[in-house]
């Protein structure tokens, strides 16, 4: 079953004070089956993050379709979907992890993870138990659980970001350089979590500059330079 299909995706940005338009991505095309992991590779500035943000609808694309096979709405074009539909999907089906933590002020680490579960309809007790499991798993110091994240280091913020997204066990998870500022032990934890989510059926699309991290994880690779997708067989990409 195809979980995500991107057809002819295009996105440009206008720099108004220079009266200039920059094309970020053009005619992007790929598909991901349920439970697969697609890795997107390419040099900095090639538009990798733009693709993920377009899928999550942080950016509204200028052209093409992004067809997602949702549990709630069936097949839906994320470009044409209403704001209400997008908010529902973000809360219940689609997760996003970036290098940066952007959260509500005066909300503790514990509350942020619990709220991610509560908005899905989980009970307070279930949210409490699963939150503590997630924070422990990603080795967040227990002394930080009731602290505000603006005091955290970059690595701590990133681990919290990952915990918030993965605790929900989303149907589709978008990963934008989620291991950028992590040490090797934390990277292993993230890899183990990704493998666990895959086993549970989560579909993933991710960007990693750490090629070694991606090895053995990805089922497919999309190359921004060639604008082509390949299937990974025994660690080596082959054209699909």
Task: Show which residues each predicted segment covers.
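Conserved ABC ATPase "signature" region
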Residues: 125-143
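The feature captures the beta-strand-to-loop junction immediately N-terminal to the Walker
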Residues: 41-43
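Q-loop/switch helix immediately C-terminal to the Walker
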Residues: 107-118
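Helix-to-loop junction immediately C-terminal to a conserved catalytic motif
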Residues: 56
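Catalytic Walker B motif of ABC-type/P-loop ATPase nucleotide-binding domains
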Residues: 173-176
């Amino acid at each position: 079953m195809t979980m995500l299909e991107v057809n002819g995706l295009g996105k440009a940005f206008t720099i108004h004070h220079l009266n200039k338009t920059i094309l970020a991505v053009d005619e992007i095309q790929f598909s991901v089956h349920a439970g697969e992991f697609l890795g997107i590779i390419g040099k900095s500035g090639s538009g990798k993050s733009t693709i993920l943000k377009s899928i999550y609808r942080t950016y509204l694309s200028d052209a093409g379709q992004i067809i997602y096979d949702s549990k709630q709405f069936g097949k839906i074009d994320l470009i044409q979907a209403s704001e209400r539909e997008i908010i529902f999907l973000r809360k219940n089906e689609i997760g996003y992890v970036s290098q940066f933590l952007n959260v509500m002020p005066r909300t503790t680490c514990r509350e942020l993870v619990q709220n991610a579960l509560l908005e899905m309809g989980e009970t307070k007790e279930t949210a409490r138990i699963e939150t503590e499991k997630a924070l422990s798993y990603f080795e967040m110091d227990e002394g930080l659980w009731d602290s505000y994240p603006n005091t955290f280091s970059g690595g701590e913020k990133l681990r919290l970001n990952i915990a918030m997204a993965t605790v929900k066990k989303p149907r589709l998870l978008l990963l934008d350089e989620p291991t950028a500022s992590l040490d090797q032990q934390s990277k292993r934890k993230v890899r183990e979590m990704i493998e666990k989510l895959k086993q549970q059926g989560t579909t993933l699309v991710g960007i990693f500059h750490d090629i070694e991290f991606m090895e053995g994880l990805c089922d497919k690779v999309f190359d921004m330079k060639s604008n082509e997708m390949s299937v990974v067989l025994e660690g080596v990409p082959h054209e699909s």
